[in-house]
Amino acid sequence: MTAPDPTAHSETPGQQTVPGPQSAPGPQDSPGGRVGGAVHAVLAAETIFGALGIALAGTILGIAAPDTIAWMILIPAAIVLIARTRPWRQSLGVRGLGIAVIVGVLFALYGSSMFTAINHLQVGTAVAISMTVGLLIGLIHGQGKRRFLSPALALAGCVVFAYQALPGTVDGKAMLSSMMESLWAGVLLLAMVMMKGLASHLGYDRGAVSGVGFIIAALGFGLRDATIHGIPALNGRFIAVIIAVSCLMFVRPTVLRRIVDQQADARTQARYNVFFPAVAMVAGVVLLGQVPSLLDLVGLALITGALWIMSGVTIMPRRIFGARGSGEVTAD
């Protein structure tokens, strides 16, 4: 998936965290009660690579529209996932194909919204705002008074970001519109996880569902896009960036996630997710030359604090589209 889980939280025995885009509740504790250095390295890699993928897409926004980039990056991921899972050997049926189409469409829409947002916002700002949506799950289903402080800090962070949008100006309106796109991306992020959780609950291979969904969505959005924007010039650099973004955002989680789910507890995963917006802001500085202002840093600090607080909140109910018979949720 595209970004670390913005809604993963700590658990207590018999309780389960809410799933998120890339990370999902693994075992309550890692083997031996400790997480090894290799797992920490994988979690750090997930955070860094995901942020790099989004920022790298920003380098070709001047060449192609956000919608175009969103469906194009689905193609390399679809090829890899289909080659790995061989969905033709599985029985998806009409229901499975329907879920696959929905998953593919949600991924394409998420990419379009996020890339539209970073057209006028810093990468870290767009990612931070999108991750605030997941805090609502903790607010509704969480336990303890801390869950009320988290959304308050997140709201304050969003206000700080919005304060920089000069009212009545073209740039100000574009920034506010991009902030709304970021929030919408957060909603789509949660919807993607719910659909993949449903696919797992019904016994479908999530890699196969994603692969089939990606290729169908890419064909559909590609045909639509060709009639509106036309296909941009496919030079070597453009194709290389598309493949790199696809690998960083979609292929990477499939490879690394199995290690994390088997060995890292939910709290550890949630702690790493907290720093995803900060890493995304650094990626924006390195790849796009985006220099954050003091207000950007304040807003980022507030939202990071909100994510940190919520990462320690226990979430109920126990089961949200969990794997059949296990009570757990996993995500590719």
What are these regions (language model features)?
Residues M1-T68, M72, V105, L109-S113, ...:
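Glycine-/small-residue-enriched transmembrane alpha-helix faces in small-molecule transporters
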Residues T59-I60, I69, A117, Q122, ...:
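Hydrophobic/aromatic residues within transmembrane alpha-helices
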Residues A44, I48-A55, V101-T116, V160, ...:
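Hydrophobic alpha-helical transmembrane segments of multi-pass membrane transport proteins
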Residues W71-M72, A126-I129, M195-I216, F250-V286:
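Helix-helix packing/entry segments at the starts of transmembrane helices
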Residues V94-V103, G144-G157, S178, G203-F214, ...:
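Cytoplasmic-side transmembrane-helix entry/capping segments in multi-pass membrane proteins
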Residues T2-E11, L61-L109, T132-I137, V187-M194, ...:
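Transmembrane alpha-helices of multi-pass small-molecule transport proteins
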